[in-house]
Each structure stands twice: as structure tokens, then as C-alpha cells.
A protein has these predicted regions:
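P-loop NTP-binding core
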Residues: 1-91
Length: 92
């Protein structure tokens, strides 16, 4: 199971016990093509799910993506790289 935190308040990230300040990259970086999804996913050994974390910087991608063509397909195309790795992908 993969949980994708798409909220700039990072509630799913914080609720998973992850300090967003300690992250090298987040879903924002993936959406803006500054990091790969595979290197950004935080693997869980105990909780039964992996996490694509968010930070407050996610508001940056909201502003940047609004003017992009085919923006509604960006996340879909990103998920192609990992879709076979997970039975379920949940988005918050």
C-alpha cells in the first residue's frame, strides 16, 4: 500500500511519524520533476504502508502547475513508474 500525501498541511506525513523538515524531497519535488518518485517514497517497515510525503512547499507546485498543459495527467504519468509495486495507492 502506498499513501500519497497531497496536502500542504502534511497531516498524513505527520500522522505517519515523519518530520517533514528531515526530508530530502517530497511530493512537491516529484510533481515539479526535481526528484523521482522512487527515491522520494518513504518505506515503512512497521506500519504496513509506504508514504509519498508532503511538506508545506506543496503550495509551490499548485501555483506552478496551474499553467501547464495536460496538468491533470502529471500525477498519472508519475505513478506509472511505481504502479506495479503496489496493490493499492491511496491519496490524501
Amino acid at each position: 500500500v502506498l499513501l500519497i500525501d497531497l496536502d500542504p498541511q502534511s497531516n498524513a506525513t505527520r500522522g505517519s511519524g515523519i518530520d517533514s523538515a528531515s526530508l530530502k524531497s517530497s511530493v512537491n519535488d516529484v510533481l515539479l520533476d526535481r526528484a523521482s518518485i522512487k527515491e522520494t517514497i518513504v518505506l515503512s517497515e512497521h506500519d504496513g504502508y509506504d508514504l509519498l510525503p508532503a511538506t508545506p512547499a506543496l503550495t509551490e507546485s499548485e501555483v506552478s502547475l496551474v499553467s501547464k498543459n495536460d496538468r491533470e495527467f502529471i500525477l498519472k504519468n508519475i505513478l506509472k513508474a511505481i504502479s506495479s509495486d503496489y496493490d493499492y495507492i491511496l491519496m490524501d
